[in-house]
Amino acid sequence: MLVGCNQLTQYTITEQEINQSLAKHNNFSKDIGLPGVADAHIVLTNLTSQIGREEPNKVTLTGDANLDMNSLFGSQKATMKLKLKALPVFDKEKGAIFLKEMEVVDATVQPEKMQTVMQTLLPYLNQALRNYFNQQPAYVLREDGSQGEAMAKKLAKGIEVKPGEIVIPFTD
C-alpha cells in the first residue's frame, strides 16, 4: 500500500525519460565563433544525461558534435565528444525542467590537430549551449500524460535531484 501513497506525494522523472526528451534537441545546430578568425557550424547529436551521479544536484550530459570549421588555416571538418554539466531548475509556470548554468567540462576533438582551434571556439560554444538550454526545456510535464504527471504540473513545489532521477515533490 505504501507505494500507492508515495505516488500521490511526488512524481519521478528518470534518466531514460530525460534522455527521450533530450533526443528532441538532437541536431541542435548553431554558428559560433569569430567570423574571419575561427568559426564553426556545430550540430549536437546523441545527447544523454546522468542525473546527480557525478555531482550532487547536477545533470551531466554527454554527446557528440559535428563541426564544420573555418579558420585562418582553411576549412576543416571535425567531430567532438562533449561532456556538459548543468543545474536542473523547475519552472512552475511552464511546468518544465530547464538545464541552467550549462557548461562544457570536457571536450575531445578529432582530428587532434583541431584541438587548438577548438579551444578558441569553446567559450562561444559554452555561451551558445547556455542560451539554448536556458530557453529550451529539457523536460516538460504534460497535463494529458499520466495522472502523476498531470498532478506534478499542478502541485509541484520544485525539484529534488537524486542519483538517476529527478523527483518533483507535491508537498513542502
Model-derived segments and spans:
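Extracellular/lumenal and peripheral-membrane lipid-interaction modules
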Residues: C5-D172
